């Protein structure tokens, strides 16, 4: 079930999440700390074909794995619709590592990057 992508996201080990999230970044003024908010609409991880408990989100690329355990499910009319994950970085090297993953993930999924002015 795992596709051969350079960068991927998994909620269950060995199973890539095919739904591409909206990703929003915020950083402190000095740029050393911040967070990335991932918002997945109707992800496969919440579908009836998946079994098990989501305990985190793995961001996997050629350098290895970044893990966040901050994952929440948002319900609409009693149905799980959104999966929200937050990755927090606490120093510039963590941010640089995250950005390398983000660039690789964007290339793997044909995405672009835009900055709010």
Swiss-Prot record:
Domain of life from the UniProt record: Bacteria
Membrane topology (UniProt): Peripheral membrane protein
Any Pfam family: Psb28
Cellular localization per UniProt: Cellular thylakoid membrane
The keyword Thylakoid belongs to this UniProt entry's keyword annotation: yes
A single GO BP: photosynthesis
Chief location: membrane
GO cellular component: photosystem II oxygen evolving complex; plasma membrane-derived thylakoid membrane
Name of the protein: Photosystem II reaction center Psb28 protein
Subunit comment: Part of the photosystem II complex.
NCBIfam families cross-referenced by the UniProt entry: PS_II_psb28
Keyword annotations from UniProtKB, A to Z: Membrane, Photosynthesis, Photosystem II, Thylakoid
Protein's organism: Prochlorococcus marinus (strain MIT 9215)
Protein family membership: Belongs to the Psb28 family.
Presence of the UniProt keyword Membrane in the record: yes
InterPro entries assigned: Psb28_c1_sf (IPR038676), PSII_Psb28_class-1 (IPR005610)
